[in-house]
Amino acid sequence: MSLPATFDLTPEDAQLLLAANVHLGSKNVQVHQEPYVFKTRPDGVNVVNVGKTWEKIVLAARIIAAIPNPEDVVAISSRTYGQRAVLKFSAHTGATAIAGRFTPGSFTNYITRSFKEPRLVIVTDPRSDAQAIKESSYVNIPVIALTDLDSPSEYVDVAIPCNNKGKHSIGLIWYLLAREVLRLRGSLVDRTQPWSIMPDLYFYRDPEEVDQQVAEEATAAADEDVKEEVAEEQTEAADWAEGNTEEVASW
């Protein structure tokens, strides 16, 4: 697919894709994913062509930006590593997020409380989000999916080939997708300047790690307060001793 020069993959983005292990695919290859294989390593792991990954990210972003109402786009992730990324993507682009379990009938049963009629669905994994893809096929909703080389591609209209099992890989794909959508909408005018949002914001974080970090920050703050109190007491003691010395000298 030939793209205008402004959509070319930059060296910085290529380094991000490689650093996040987006290029590491599975050992098995589904027949429709064969065009995305760059090569096979000696250990049997198939390497994804990140150039084709970028082309599909741009294509998906152009589809998303073409929908007038951002809320008509539904971003789904039942996979734990993709839930934070989906929520951040929705916050930045205005899409509707479904993070966690997808309620069966959300697209087909209008009686359910969670019923939606989207114009586009984006899923993190065709296997874990199979119910959403199946219901989308019933009501003719186009589907964009992050697919590994062994992922099923039935009812998937646009497949973004990548490593959809790693937390950094998933977060980075959603980050790049959100950035390209905002650029196409005109929210980010200058393509030569980096986005102020960092990719780390889209990465999954273990709740225990977050709690531990908060506890460490609280402990550090408490230690600083204690040090300040001790310093103040020492200063007061020094001032008092100096005053007494002057009184004794005056006698």
Swiss-Prot record:
Whether Ribonucleoprotein counts among this entry's keywords is yes
CDD domains given for it? RPS2
Sites where N-acetylserine occurs are at: S2
Annotated segments matching region Disordered: 213-251
What does UniProt give as GO cellular component? Answer: cytosolic small ribosomal subunit
Q: Which residues cross the membrane?
A: none
Q: One MF term from GO for this chain?
A: structural constituent of ribosome
Residue ranges with Acidic residues bias: 222-236
Example GO biological process: ribosomal small subunit assembly
Q: What are the subcellular locations of this protein?
A: Cytoplasm
Q: PANTHER family of this UniProt entry?
A: 40S RIBOSOMAL PROTEIN SA
Q: What does the subunit comment say?
A: Component of the small ribosomal subunit. Mature ribosomes consist of a small (40S) and a large (60S) subunit. The 40S subunit contains about 33 different proteins and 1 molecule of RNA (18S). The 60S subunit contains about 49 different proteins and 3 molecules of RNA (25S, 5.8S and 5S). Interacts with RPS21.
Q: Relate the protein's function as given in its record.
A: Required for the assembly and/or stability of the 40S ribosomal subunit. Required for the processing of the 20S rRNA-precursor to mature 18S rRNA in a late step of the maturation of 40S ribosomal subunits.
Record NCBIfam families:
uS2_euk_arch (TIGR01012)
- Similarity comment text for this entry: Belongs to the universal ribosomal protein uS2 family.
Listed name of the protein:
Small ribosomal subunit protein uS2
**What does the organism's lineage look like at the top?**
Eukaryota, Fungi, Dikarya, Ascomycota, Saccharomycotina
